């Protein structure tokens, strides 16, 4: 029955991949993803209208006793008269300019862009035949995902999207437990099913999930499809496999490499690409993986009072992630009118300025024999933002053939000593060293206790310095 839901669409795709793990383990991560290293995530939706707390406002406003519930009642009145649906007309996107957005992302040095197609709230940010609750039919009356897809591709970046639809099974359930606008049957197809989180999704709901996912693939041809955590439900196993085989076969039909991002253990190794939310790894991981993190510290969507990561944080953590065979998918949360905050813009432009000088050490690289060295311990695991800043004594390595890039996660003021490239370490003989973005002659000595690099007179970029080390 699951496969049958795909109808003729699945029949048209080349049937190389079958919906079983043995077949799906033939998947190879495409080179475009391994080369890209840096992408932009976009959390934008109706939740940006109240702009309070986080993008989980639509759930939390229905949880009695929560700060969001108190704010909702004090600001908008009784929830039975003004519920989440009533924010939709206020979600105008009046200043949404996809050209300006993608131009900014390109200046930031991003190589792929992933807007959220549907978040946990159940409001689709695209034109769909499967739900009337969508941005084309109401609110801004625009196919937001479609407009972004067209512009992202036009400007030469890779288009992806995310679906958080499965979490909607339980996300809005608080409204069932007190007097709210849930009692109005006209809202049932938006707020429902609103079941308990420990309840297994029904076959009807999982079939609907699959149909929405395949519709997105057919309409927009994304090269990356990002899933949030709840698809790992055991009952979802046949649906996960069916979607993966469908999508990977579509990639073959399009002659484009495609990527599924998953969390936790939703997919086995070598069948899709692992994603860690606000987290990193302690060492190199094969196969390739990804971190999704947000410039905003408190919310993925726009929320008043949010604080933000600066370019230094993003750059040093990007380097750390890339040295371990990972990518960084960095999130922004635009306002409800479609404008991007000054803080996020500054961080993006600062990151892009550094990548303009040092991108050679990032794009198209692969991990070296070791990821790095230095005194600062890297955060590891999901929900593990780097609390201790890196320093100039921390170095991370990337490689292209016989070239090793040693990236200092600060600007050295004294000698830099790289133990992994000591004369007796067995990792190669140094032939030449240069600084990316500079014509300055680098002074160095390869000694038994390490490769000693004397400080440069000028740093060509802020925050981190990349040495290009050519080995014999």
Give, region by region, the residue ranges found by the protein language model.
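Mature catalytic domains of secreted/periplasmic carbohydrate-active enzymes
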Residues: 14-472
């Amino acid at each position: 029955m699951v496969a049958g839901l795909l109808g003729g669409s699945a029949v048209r795709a080349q049937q190389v991949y079958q919906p079983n793990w043995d077949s799906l383990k033939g998947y190879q991560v495409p080179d475009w993803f391994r080369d890209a290293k840096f992408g932009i995530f976009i959390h934008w939706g109706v939740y940006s209208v109240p702009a309070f707390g986080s993008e989980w406002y639509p759930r939390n406003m229905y949880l009695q006793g929560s700060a969001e519930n108190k704010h909702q009642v004090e600001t908008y009145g009784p929830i039975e008269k003004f519920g989440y649906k009533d924010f939709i007309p206020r979600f105008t996107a009046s200043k949404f300019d996809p050209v300006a957005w993608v131009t900014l992302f390109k200046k930031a040095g991003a190589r792929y862009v992933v807007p959220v197609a549907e978040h946990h709230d159940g409001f689709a940010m695209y034109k769909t035949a499967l739900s009337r609750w969508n941005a084309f039919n109401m609110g801004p009356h625009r196919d937001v995902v479609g407009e972004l897809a067209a512009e992202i591709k036009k400007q030469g970046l890779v288009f992806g999207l995310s679906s958080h639809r499965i979490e909607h099974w339980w996300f809005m359930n608080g409204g069932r437990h007190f007097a709210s606008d849930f009692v109005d049957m006209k809202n049932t197809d938006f707020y429902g099913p609103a079941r308990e989180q420990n309840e297994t999704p029904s076959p009807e709901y999982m079939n609907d999930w699959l149909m929405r996912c395949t519709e997105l693939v057919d309409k927009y041809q994304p090269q990356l499809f990002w899933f949030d955590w709840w698809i790992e439900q055991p009952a979802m196993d046949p649906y996960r496999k069916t979607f993966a085989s469908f999508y990977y076969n579509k990639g073959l039909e399009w002659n484009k490499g495609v990527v599924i991002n998953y969390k936790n253990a939703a997919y086995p190794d070598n069948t899709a690409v692992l994603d860690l939310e606000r987290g990193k790894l302690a060492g190199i991981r094969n196969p390739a993986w990804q971190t999704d993190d947000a410039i905003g510290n408190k919310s993925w969507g726009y929320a008043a009072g949010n604080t933000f990561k600066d370019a230094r944080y993003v750059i040093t953590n990007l380097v750390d992630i890339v040295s371990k065979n990972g990518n960084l998918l960095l999130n922004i949360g635009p306002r409800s009118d479609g404008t991007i905050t000054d803080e996020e813009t500054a961080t993006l432009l600062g990151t892009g300025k550094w990548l303009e000088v040092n991108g050679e050490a990032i794009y198209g690289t692969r991990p070296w024999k070791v990821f790095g060295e230095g005194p600062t311990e890297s955060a590891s695991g999901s929900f593990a933002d780097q609390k201790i800043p890196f320093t100039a004594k921390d170095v991370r390595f990337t490689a292209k053939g016989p070239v090793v890039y040693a990236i200092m996660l600060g600007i050295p003021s004294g000698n830099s000593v790289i133990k992994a490239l000591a004369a007796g370490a067995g990792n190669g003989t140094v032939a030449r060293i240069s600084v990316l973005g500079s014509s300055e002659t680098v002074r160095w000595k390869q000694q038994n206790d390490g490769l000693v690099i004397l400080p440069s007179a000028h740093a060509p970029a802020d925050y981190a310095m990349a040495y290009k080390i050519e080995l014999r």
